[in-house]
Amino acid sequence: MSKIRQLLNKIPWYTDQVHSIFMYLIMGGFTTIINIVTFWLCTYILNWDYRIANTIAFIASVLFAYFSNKKFVFDSYTPTWKDRLREASSFFGFRCLTYIIDILVMILLISYLSVDELWAKIWTNIIVLVLNYVFSKWIIFKVQK
């Protein structure tokens, strides 16, 4: 256990569940920054179509999210290759589901409602962040009994 976690554990209301949410927000924040900065670079610097930029941002942020969530948020231990494969395929499968939601909301906001690309990306990230937490907490990284 890290020294920071030991200090935080001295706070009476700081439970494992609070820690999990706190760490998810921290790692989710980094993941969101990676996603938005990658999207911004691809759309505003490279002048790529927002759908391509969104896909590249998705790939970069999901790779970061898998390893950071596994280690720092859910402290997931998978002893066998079968467990690792199940966990990884579940993670990437649910992230593909939220990517579909992400791209559909982006198309709706940008193409039909004329929302600025960067603002649309920020709003879709909020939706995806909540969905990803729910999927990760209760399905992907659930504690094995």
Swiss-Prot record:
Keyword Ligase: no
InterPro entries in the cross-refs: GtrA_CellWall_Glycosyl, GtrA_DPMS_TM
Keywords: Cell membrane, Membrane, Transmembrane, Transmembrane helix, Transport
A cellular component term, taken from the record's GO annotations: plasma membrane
Transmembrane segments annotated in the record for this chain: 21-41, 45-65, 91-111, 122-142
Cystines in this chain: none
Topological type in the membrane: Multi-pass membrane protein
Subcellular location per the Swiss-Prot or TrEMBL entry: Cell membrane
Sections of the chain in a coiled coil: none
GO BP term, pick one: polysaccharide biosynthetic process
Chief location category: membrane
Described function: Involved in the decoration of cell wall teichoic acid with galactose and glucose.
Family stated for the protein in its record: Belongs to the GtrA family.
Record protein name field: Cell wall teichoic acid glycosylation protein GtcA
Species per Swiss-Prot/TrEMBL record: Listeria monocytogenes
Classification of source organism: Bacteria, Bacillati, Bacillota, Bacilli, Bacillales
